[in-house]
């Protein structure tokens, strides 16, 4: 049909940009995601974080004695925000590697510093560390919103703590309770979730710069086998990126148990939200609790 033809024409027209780089786009994000969360998972956030990581690495290597000048560092910082997507996109068609394409694109802006970009690192240095940073920021945003729900629900529970209502077991009439007491059950689940969320956030650690197999072999070569110097790399990078520590041991990638922890705590929050909303839906059927509907 005509709509499909128009879409194909747009895709063919290289002068038309159909994606926005300052937000994450999916069929669900426009309806359900906040602008803050969309930005956290956006291309802009991702690639600007890559560049921050490259700057942190270069600064660390300079401070530990490699032949890197402050002029080179300043040049990297001057172009940290202006992501040249067009250059990276064209380069990726040639090399078929996203990280190397962006190393090249960053180097186009940094004539004097292009030789020190990504020095000694692997793709996972930017890829995995950025994933950790993005997940941590996203979890902190979830925490803010979870605290808001807990606060509002606690007010609701206190307001209706003495309002009697029928309690149920197996959704069969049982004994009297109060509306506030019922709300406190939803509230308690969310408090459990907050405790678990705080634990996950507190234990988020950067990967660091571990090299191809987690042995930092490339840095052993760069620093001529100086183990004491190499031991300082991860801690210095972590501090520059706002973290207390890096994972003490890993391969090239961070342990995917980290992803499992994140998914698990998000699942727990979703389970609590489901219990909360499902109870309201059932009570709405009984005309005991109703959600508001606006005129339009």
Please report, for each region that a protein language model flagged, where it lies by residue.
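A helix-coil-helix interface module used to build multimeric assemblies
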Residues: 18-217, 228-238
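A short, charged helix-loop
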Residues: 236-252
